[in-house]
Swiss-Prot record:
Binds 1 zinc ion per subunit. Its cofactor is Zn(2+). Residues 1-24 form the signal peptide. Its EC number is 3.4.24.-. The gene is yxkI. Zn(2+) binds at residues 389, 393, 457. This is Putative membrane metalloprotease YxkI. It comes from Bacillus subtilis (strain 168). GO terms for molecular function: metal ion binding; metalloendopeptidase activity. InterPro entries: HtpX_protease, Peptidase_M48, PH_YxkI. It is a multi-pass membrane protein. One of its GO terms (biological process) is proteolysis. Its main location: membrane. It is found in: Cell membrane. The chain crosses the membrane at residues 33-53, 56-76, 98-118, 128-148, 267-289, 294-311, 400-420, 432-452.
Amino acid sequence: MPMGTHLFLFMLLGLGFYLISALAAKLIPAIDFWIDIVLWVGAAAYIFSHLSFMDGIVSLATMFYCYWTAMDLIVSERVEKPSGDWQEIELAKNKTRLLSDITLTAIVFAGAVIFFIYGPDTSPLKYVILLGMISGGGALVKRILNVFSVKVFYSAALEKLHISSHYETRTYPLSDLKNIQLESTADLLKLHPLLTMYSSRLDLTTSFQQVIKLSLPGETLFLTVKEPQKWKTILQEYTDAENNVDNVISVLPFYHRKNVKRLLGKLYFAASVKGVSAYALLVLALYALHASPWVMAVAVILYWVFNMYMSDRVLRAAMDAKSCHHPHVQAAADKIFRSAGISHVRIYETESDDYNGMAVGMNVGRSMVILTSATLTLPQRVIEGILAHEAIHIKKRDVLSSQLLRFLYLGAVVGIFLLFEQHITHPEAHKIALWAFIMAIIILFQLYQSFCSQWMEVRADNLGASLLDGGYKQMAEALRILAVRQDEDIQKQSAYSSEAGEDELQIDSLTRDKSWFFRLIDFQFAPHPPMYWRVGTLLSNKGHGVLKRWLRDRLKESITLK
C-alpha cells in the first residue's frame, strides 16, 4: 500500500485537479467538464500502468477524496449583507474559543495520528486514518474560517436576522423563533461536532462569554454577542413568552471537575465509536509486542464486542441524554413495554430540534429509548406510536442484530479477499474484473444494509401497532404527523438558506415520488421505506402479509417507470 511521500503526492494531485477544474469553470466554462474527464482518465491510466492494482485503487481513491474535500472547502463568493436597512450585531471574539476546538480535535485524533506515524506501512488502517484526517481537517478548516468571517445582522423593519460567514449564510424570519435563552458560556461538550451525534446545532460561537441560544424549526443557533442581555430582550419580543427561560443557564467549563465524567464519556465515544483512535492504539500496542495477525484480529473483535455491551452508556453520554421527567410519557411507556413483554427499559430525552426517537442497547436488560426534545412536543398519541415502534426494536434485539449482520457481511468480504490472495497470483492481469468486483461489493453492502434495516422497520411498525389502543390506525396517524412535522422543518431550513432563491425546496414524504430514480433510492438504499408506503400499508394491510407486500413493492417500485 502506498504510504508516506507517495500518498501525500496523490493528495496534492487531488487538490490540484480541483483547482484546475475550478479555474477552467471560471475561464472556459464551455469545456470545463471535458477537462475534468481528460485529467481523471489520464491520471487513472498513469497510475494503473505504474502501480499494482490495489495500490492504484488506493491512490486514485485518495485523489478523489481530496478532490471532493477541496470542493467542499472552496465556496463561491457570498453576499455579506442583503439589501435593506440592517443593523450589525457586534460579536465577542477571542482566540481561546478557537484554540479549544483545535485542542479537542487534536485529542480525539491523537491515537490515530500516533498509529499513522509509528504503525506498519502495510496496515490498511493507515489508509482509513488518512481519510479520517482529511475529513476532520476539512471540518476544522471550515470552523476556523467561520469564526473569522461570521457576521450577524438584524432588521427591525423586515423582522429578520441574517447570518453571514465563509460557509454559512442564513436569513431567519423572526416570526419562526421558538424561544431564546442565555447560557453562561459556550458548552464545548455539546457543541463540538466530534463529541455529539444527531445534532442540529449551528455553532457560531466565537468566545467563552455568554451565549445566546436561538431555537428555530429544525435547528438551534448559538452566538456570542457583546451585549447578550440587550439582544435577548429585543429578540424575545418575537417569541412566545411562556417558552422563554429568564435566568441565565449555568454551563461549567469542559475541564471542570464536575464535568470530568461527561468529558471522558464523550472522548471515549469520539475515539471508539465516531473514530478509530482507540482501535488504532490497541493494534499499535499489539504490533509493538509482535503479536500475530490472528491475535490482533481477536483483540479488535473483543474490543468491538465490549463497545457493543457499553453502547447504552456511551450513546447516552454522547447525546447528553437525561431521564425523562414527563409523567404522561413515562406512564405511556410503562404500559406499552408491559404489553410488549419487556422490562427494565428506561426513557431518556436529549436536546434536539429533530423529530426522532431511537432504541439504544444491545440486549433487553440494558436497553433504553431516547426521545428528542422536539419529539416530546408532539401529541400524546404520536409519542405513543413512536414508543411502540421502538419497543419492538428492543424486543427483537434489532440494535444487536443490525451490528451482527453488518459484521457478517464484512467478514464474508474479508474471507473472499483472502481467497483471492491465495488463488490469484497476478491481480494485474484481472484489473477490470477486480475493479468491477470492488464496486459491486460497495453497492451490495448498501443494498444489504438497506434490506436488513427496512425489514426491521416494517416489522416494528406493524408489531408496534398491536401494542397501541388505537392499533394500526393510531400508528399510521403517528407516522403521518411525524412526517408532516419533519417535512415542515426541512422546508423551513431550505428557506433560511440565502442560496435557495426563488426555487424553494418542496418536500412531501407522504406522496409517492413520480421519479423512478428516487423511488429506487428510497426502496433499495435508504434505511427506512418511504413514509407514504409505511402509512399506506398500515391502513390497508393491517399487519396481514405486510412483509410479502414489502418484498413485492420493493422490487416493483424500483423498476416501474411510472
